[in-house]
Amino acid sequence: MLQQRTIKTLTRAVGVGLHSGQRVELTLRPAAPDTGIVFRRVDLPEPVDIPIRAESVVDTRMASTIGVGGAKVHTVEHLMSACAGLGLDNLYIDITAEEVPILDGSSASFVFLLQSAGVVLQNAPKKFIRVTRPVEVREGEGQQLKWARLEPYHGYKLRFEIDFAHPAVDSTGQSVEFDLGSGNYTRDIARARTFGFTKDVEMMRASGLALGGGLDNAIVMDDYKVLNADGLRYDDEFVKHKILDAIGDLYIVGRPLLAAYSAFRSGHAMNNRLLRELLAHEDAWEIATFESERQAPSGFAAPVQAW
């Protein structure tokens, strides 16, 4: 049986929110089988649980935000990407502010935290959402076109293409394909950082956003080049971060996907639209479990490689 996973012991992190600049503490705790991933706003007078699911997404401007009632948690995608990359099904995430800390701008710190806590198997079958027919969302035309698609696939692979007319981006790969079953998430994807332009950062800060952003937690570019002294972590770090984001955005569906995802210029909003489009058509998906590892997609039974 392909089993569900949680962490062995609790672990903690402290950082600042990318947009709020607020200090925030995270406590990641083990959870029982079939709990799913649940954020808990412990800073409120009465703690509020916000479970991860597509309909919990209440805002997709600049990040993926989930909420219940008036309680929200912003910028969940990097932590969700780490959970997906490690195959974690069940987790409580206690948080003391309304935004997940940005840490180094990638998923690497979250992967390290979770692997340090230990990943353990649970006595319950892992439940996948298996895509059974193609689902697509599109927006715009010509140079404004963007789209995202899910198609049937015995496994989970992602292909993303970006289109940035910038010298620093043009000199790197604008498309990448990654198969989560390879077991190479930590090596090939997790370290890819969020990126932005100095002119956009200045405008965002004037609007009260990106207050916690800087060269230590993002790739920052002027009109011509990357400003970070250490350069890029991957030759194609820009598009790999888009894959990282997509893995996190799509994990908000609440279960691991079995599908081939492809996208052109997609972002948080379109990824969530794609999930909602999928769930709205009951003939497009089904719940799948695997009684034997031989039936399961390649690589899904093995633990993800450590650093």
From Swiss-Prot:
Keywords, in A-Z order: Hydrolase, Lipid A biosynthesis, Lipid biosynthesis, Lipid metabolism, Metal-binding, Zinc
Signal peptide: none
Cofactors, names only: Zn(2+)
GO molecular function: metal ion binding; UDP-3-O-acyl-N-acetylglucosamine deacetylase activity
Positions contributing to Zn(2+) binding: H78, H241, D245
Residues of the active site: H268
Gene Ontology CC, one term: membrane
Pfam family, one: LpxC
A GO BP entry: lipid A biosynthetic process
Keyword Lipid metabolism: yes
Function of the molecule: Catalyzes the hydrolysis of UDP-3-O-myristoyl-N-acetylglucosamine to form UDP-3-O-myristoylglucosamine and acetate, the committed step in lipid A biosynthesis.
The family this protein is said to belong to: Belongs to the LpxC family.
Protein name: UDP-3-O-acyl-N-acetylglucosamine deacetylase
Organism whose genome encodes this protein: Paracidovorax citrulli (strain AAC00-1) (Acidovorax citrulli)
